[in-house]
Amino acid sequence: MMSILLMILGVTIITLSVLVNQITKNTFTKNNPNLDVVVGAKGSPLQLVLSSIHHIDIPTGNISYKNAKKIMKHPAIKFGVPISLGDNFQNYRIVGTDKKFLKLYDAELEIGSMWEKPMQSVIGSNVANFTKLKIDKFFVGSHGLIDTGDIHSEQPYKVVGILKKTGTILDNLIITSLDSVWNLHSNQNDIFKNSDSLEITALLLKYKNKTSVFSFPRLINKNTSMQAASPNLEISKLFKLTG
């Protein structure tokens, strides 16, 4: 009898393990909006992918926005979306970016409007539900990617839009302009006088065609101070390691 119970328990554990693994794979798949490559500061390519697309790790550092704009104009690139990380509100990450970021997820507004100037924000459905933020409400972000209480009290964000649920990581994000993030982390009097000093966290890229899948990352990794990482390749490696 005991052996039968142990066998049933073993099968149950295996089944649950497979189920959890499958759910995790599905989540990673949904969170990547068919991006081909991520460019960011040198370090762990997996860390770069996890932090920039799945928002479950810390970034590898920052890169020059001036250099990022050059990469977006490369003949191999169809489009690029810059992102800047570093702050949160109640543990929900604040992402500085442009409006192409929302198009990656086919995002639609539930209520309100898109941001039009610095310190305006659009929030995901889960953020709205759990923080109780509403249109025209103000909030202040905290330094870092987890809530430490070290807040930017001098410059609050205003909620101007709430997104419809997407079933992706976007539901857990607060989206604003790059200018908003730069304003908070730089000397505002000098920020736009010296655009060469502006930085972002990463660049999310889509190729014009798949022939660039090997040549473009090699170009970035060998000839620049940045790294290029394939989201699909890094997540595939992760699941091979974890079984």
Please place each PLM-identified region on the residue numbering.
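Hydrophobic secondary-structure segments that place a key small or acidic residue at a functional site
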Residues: 88-99, 107-188
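Hydrophobic alpha-helical transmembrane segments of multi-pass inner-membrane transport and secretion
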Residues: 1-24, 239-243
